[in-house]
UniProtKB/Swiss-Prot annotation:
It is found in: Endoplasmic reticulum membrane. The keyword Protein biosynthesis does not apply. GO terms for cellular component: endoplasmic reticulum exit site; endoplasmic reticulum membrane; ER to Golgi transport vesicle membrane. One of its GO terms (biological process) is Golgi organization. Involved in the initiation of assembly of the COPII coat required for the formation of transport vesicles from the endoplasmic reticulum (ER) and the selection of cargo molecules. Also involved in autophagy. Residues 461-470, 1591-1613 have a biased composition (Basic and acidic residues). Pfam families: Sec16, Sec16_N, TPR_Sec16. It comes from Aspergillus terreus (strain NIH 2624 / FGSC A1156). This is COPII coat assembly protein sec16. Gene3D superfamilies: 1.25.40.1030.
Amino acid sequence: MAASEQFASWNPALRSEDHSIPTIENTLDQQPTSPAEQVESQAKTVTPPPQEDSPLQEVPEDVVDTVVPPVSGDTQPIANALDQDQTQPQPEETDRDIPPMIVDTPKDTQETQESVPRNATDEGNVFSLESNDSAFPTTQNAPDLSWAEDSQPQAVERHDDSVWTLHQQSKETPTSPNGDFGTTSHDLWGSPTSPGGEHDFFDQLKTQTKPIYVPPESESRYEEGVPLLDEGVSSPTEPTANQESRIDQIFDGDEDEEGAFFNEVQESASTDESRPYGHMTRKSTSQVLDSLDTSMKSPVSDASPTAREFDNILAAAASGNQVKKSTSEEDLAARWQAELSDEEPEPAPEDDLAARWQAELDDDDDMLLEDETSGELPNQEMHMNGIASQAAPPVLSSPFGTPESAARPKAQPTSYTPHQPSTSDLLQGIPAQGYAQGNTTTAPNYFAPQPPKPATSRAESFAERSKEGYKSPYDLPEDLARPRRAAATHRPVVVPGNNMAPGPPAASVPPPQRAPSMPTPPMATLPSTTTAPPAPPKNFYEELPPPPPKPQSRPSSSGRYTPGPASSHPVLPPPSNPYAAVPPPPTVDSSIPPHLHQPEKTDPYVNLLAPSAPSAPSAPSAASRYSPKPPSLQGGVKPPPSPRYSPAPPPSTAPVPPRNRYASQPSSGPGQTAVLPFQPRTSSPLAYHEKVSYQPQEGLRKPSFAEQESAAGPQNEIQEQPVGHHVGQSVPGGTVVDTQNTGAPMAPQQTSPPRNPYAPPAYVNDFSKRVAPMTSAPPPASAPPATETQFMPPRRSQTQSPSQQVLGPRLSVPAVDPLQRPASVHGSGSPTKSSSPYAPSAPAHNRVASQQLEFIPPTDGQELDPLERWRGAPIVKFGFGGAIVSCFPKHIPRYTAGQPAPKIMAAPGEARIHQLRDWVPIADSIVQHPGPLKNKSKKKDLLAWLSSKIAQFENEGISEAAQLHPESGMRHDEKILLWKIIRILVEHDGTLEGSEPIKKALRGVIFPHLAENPDSSESYGANVPSFGDIKPLDAPSKSDAMDPQAIGNLRNYLLLGDREKAVWSAVDNRLWGHAMVIASTMDKSVWKQVVQEFVRREVRSATGNTESLAALYEIFAGNVEESIDELVPPSARAGMQMISTVDGHGPAKNALDGLNSWRDTLGLVLNNRSPDDHQALLSLGRLLLSYGRVEAAHICFIFSRAAVFGGADDPQSCIVLLGADHQHLPSTILQDEDAFLLTEAYEYATTILAGAPMATLPHLLAFKLLHAWSLADRGRKAEAQQYCDAIAASLKSTTKPSGYHNQHLLFGVDELSARLRQTTNDGGSSWISKPSMEKVSGSMWAKFNSFVAGDDSDAASTGSGKAGEGDVGPFARFTGTPTLSLFLAADPPVTSQITNMPLMHLLNNLADGLRWTPSAHHPMDFPFPQRRGSQEPATPMENTFYQGGGPYGSPPAVGYQSTPPQTSYMPLAPVEEDSATQSYPAASAPPHEPAMNTSPYLPPGGPSSQPLNRGSMMDSQTGASSYMPAETSGSSYTPPTFNTGYEPPTIETTAAPDTQSTDEPADDVPLKKKKSFMDDDDDDDIAARAAALQKAEKERKDREAEENFRRIAEAEAKNAPQQKKSSWWPGWFGGGKKEENNNSGGPIRAKLGEENSFYYDKELKKWVNKKDPNSATVSRGTPPPPRGAAPPSRTASGSSAPPPAASPKPPGPDSRPTSSAGAPPPQTGSPAPSLLGAPPPFLNAVPRSVSTGAAAPPTRPGSSSGPPPRPATSLSTASSIDDLLGPPQARKGGTVKGKKKGRYVDVMAK
């Protein structure tokens, strides 16, 4: 006890944080602490600064430096260590005699701090000896002590003094304390371990480490011990000065004899307390080791009698000084044997140990090793939390360190810490003891045997001898390393780690221990020599013991000690970088101690860069090779091969062959890692290549490092191996990175190259194994990455047999990285794999700089092109139907005399046509979709297709895109369920309820588990956890129990007739049956409340998922809307979590989990239908939709039978496409083809299969058109044509046009069908079958025929043809007339095409006006509105069209323009408008422009107002447009010849004029007319005559056709196109020309000619529509000559007119959509939505705004102002023939047109 206490007092790590000197008893009490605590204590000891009391803090750095030098001294340091050891044994006796040694007690420590300065010298020696002795017996404690001593030698001395001062009587007691404290150490040092040999030595260290860990005070003291290195510093615990002297004395003894080191420890423990001080003083250069020796002494002496004996031996040795140690290894061996025999630790044979020590001392390399070791130890101290003790391993590892030399013992602790712990044996056995401290904790038992072992000396010699270093993988010393290997044959190179018996191997033993806690200490020791600074950053890895052992074994075998000089005490911090230390090629092992590698770092790096370099490159290459990326470039031993093979290329410091040989194992790890980023290095060339290819992925090694973190043990194992090289990896800059500290960085280097996170695990593992060398190579580029990489990859052969070593560490490491494998394994890896597609290696590009050839420039001016397009460039054009035309230029070389290189002549290449499906194959389902679904015969094919799709969804799983959704799995299942329900719907002809088979089918789909038990009494909700088993938490039976008092109160309430009180009394008493019976006779609200209360208190409180049952009860009670609150409470929907304070139930689960009960709720509702349950399902669907559960929501909508199918722009639409979320993801609707096809199947099942003649989802027609385009692009033109025909048939069959049947849709269908006819072989058949299609879509020929004949051929176009048909016949003769009729008709393309040429010509003439018109509106949409303007100027549809049409109609319109009908038709109206506009350019432009602006406005304002504005404008324009023929003919009256002039007066004009005329009197019209006449005098005259004639005729015709017109007007109100056409008829007959213009603005269908209700109002001076009173107010068209003035007013009126919706409808008839527009107009506000959702805009667009747009742009605002009167005239302004005629004349302007107008005037006059 006393001895242990003394040791604790001597060892700052054991001292209490308060620095009070603990009593021996206290120390003993602390000793029982677990190894983890010991480790912690060591960790604390490692950090000198933390403790104020710790002497280390006070100790100046000089002392620390002084401590390190002993390592460099071969004989003297060893002797010092021996002296310390000897002295420690003496203190052991002394401790036994002197209880005061109990310094561990905090209070004692405080006293000691005060007393130590006085007594440190006297008692310090004794204590030192005792502590050393104790340390030896207490192998576990010894490591800590050694570390503490290294860091706190002075403190220890002081502490001893204080201890002695405070407790002189406990001098004898120390034995027991040591026995207690150092029992472990005693076992390690005292008995079996110390005599055992190197392994014993490490065991001793291990034992010592444990004691240190045990006492918390010791831990704090250990931290203090770190400062002990500075004698000058005095810690509160004990005076530093005295202790320093004691330590010096102790070191002196150690210097005298290597073997006497331990003797001195013992002796000093008993008698020569002053010696330890003296030794410590002498070894001020290596105070760390001395301090460790001192701490070792006390633990050993206390540990056991054997330890005492050993202390005695050490005391003798101490008296003999360290020289004695070096002089007599036999004595040391004897001491060790005695100690080991007493100690439990595995003792290394004394003979072995002595021989090893002797060899170590004899070796010239000892000094080098000492230096390295000294550097390594300090580095380790810095590197590890408990490294301080390791840094001073002389005490802990003094057994081996002493025999070797002062430097050697230090090296041993280092090697012990880094390498031996990494061995699997050590790692397995020692990890628990707190490897964090380092070797001290991990190898206390081993340390005891090691001190006697000369393995350290061998390590030194090995350090010098890279060859020998290879031999000893366990310790830095060569001898130790080799014997270690021999002993640990099972480990090829890591044998040291496996065999702990030998002294050198003992070092390996500690590493395993350290691997668990501190892999860095051992590794750190080796790499510390090379890269001490890097190690500190990697203190994290200090906990990993394996790295330290590896450095030892590796340094000993390779030139690890060679870097010894470099491995000054600073090296210790690098231990974390031991792998980084790899840079020193020879010292792969020494890479652990960066010292060895530092010298070679630069060289290794250079070697890596230049594999040819034999020597320096060899070492780095060895490191590289050892690193998982040992390049095949370097051979095993030879310097030249070493760069390539990268096996331990000897560092410049050591012989090349030995290092190469040794380094082959370790060098591969560090050397390659650090050195071979540029140059491939691997154990094998293949491995190297793999590494090289993957080197760019070093960054990825971090992941590998993370992986290695999981296998911290493997890292340690690797460290045991030559990992030391990995431990110290050299960065290209020559800096050693401490891979060990990094955790497993070195291991990653060897274990695996950077991993590709995307690579398959199998491949990654194999690749990492094969590419491990590569891991090392990349580090040179970046040391940290290399380190990380090292961590992941198995250790490439650190030694000759890297695989064995790697395996050994793996075995020792609990967590084995699959990548960690022998270097041979990695080397064998095939480069191919390394370059696997998953490999992270950067893609290799086999590219050669293209030769720059000179082009021959052209001489025709193209050479001036700044883009130099004359050089030629590939041209690719995507055409219709999936056709692709490509043309690549030809570069023809031209050779000329005297020119070495040819010049290139660019010439066009061959144009080739390809099919898109050949370039981009389109995956089609096994069963082709049978669409379009036209009849019941498709049912079977549809079911087969649905089944195939369902199977596909089930087999393919969740798509990558769907996985982005947080609930992708549930949504996938719900999608499959939706498809299955649609299949059932198709199977049962659109029925989902009623019959038992349907219920059974639904049950099998919604609740598959019930299908097996169809007779189950449970409903759909059965999947809910058996409700029958659910019972209220408060026992429902009790709640229903009869309470006499409650029943009495209930009866009393009922006697009084107060049923309400009776109900609530029953509720309060939980008499639910009574409450419900009474509530059933009361108001419904009471019943609902009672049920709600019942659900809340009984159902919701029950265990299990009762949400669906609660919802069902709510539905039964009539709480339909509130039923969903049972699934997701309102608070949860608001984002809050409510907790009930009544029932005391907290939120047992997520409130949103109730959404998952939707299926149960649906099943319960379907099996228990109630009157309003469909509303509940609708609410449930909306709830699900709000949370993004689209498929589930649509299922509920389908069963609710109340869902609204509509366009995306319809806010009331519940479903646009089944399975598509139009609310949250509207942009995806058009991209999901499956959603459209599924919706088409639903439409087919609910309409055709249900008995309806046609499909009834109007909004789906637009999607069908899109699908047809998609099919055409795929080359499936026949199917696309079928869809076009189906759309046409649907449009034709409907008697009530929908807003979705807009003109965009019509034009789109016509455009697509026209293209398909032109590009398909069966076009003839298409033409034959086209008539109906043409009527619907506006086929050119069909429209022309209808226009000429006046038939209502355009049924689908809603009678637009009618409006112009009357006029059509007559106007068909005129070029302008056909255009007008065409324009009026939704289908006008045919006619328009005929008139298109003239109109286009006029368009050019009137470009200004036309241009202006489009500018007012959207370029695409506006043109249509213009025509519409004339056709249906006031129709909101037009506005709607503009909005909705933008996306849809615009493109089709453009396309249609290209189509002859479209083009002809569109230009016509715009041209006339333009001419009208031109005639009234100035004034009309402004007003009309507003009108145009209005059309854009329509979407927001509504179609009605827009139509009016447009109507006015459009009517003026369309009036112009309808007049356009007239205008085309000339601004003079001649335009009427086209009937366009006349058309404006038609009913179409009436509608618009109503709005516009209402806003503005006829003045506007006269102004326009005047303007137009002013523009053209002839036109003015003609206009005047025409005005009179038209007025007269209009009055007559209006009267005659009033009745007919009224009927037609009513029809037109529904179908605007019809009215417009009717206006054409009146225009044709005479006074009705204005109506014709109106018709031109409106659909052709309206045949208002015969029934023209227009009459000429003399007061208004315009034609007035009798049926439309508002038209009388609109006088815009009255004065044709003042067109300029009139148009502005009209425009203004049009602007004001927008409000009227009625007028829009009249124009609407021109385009079928108008009627539908009535509803859509609000939607028109949104142009895009209108495509699908707002049909009205499409309708407006039907006039083909595109062509109009083309024409419109030319139109000027002023000219457009002219046209507005015409639109007004066409509907409302039509009453004024003059207005009608005037605008056309103005537009026509041309003489030819004038002639035509004249003809027309004549007709009108007649």
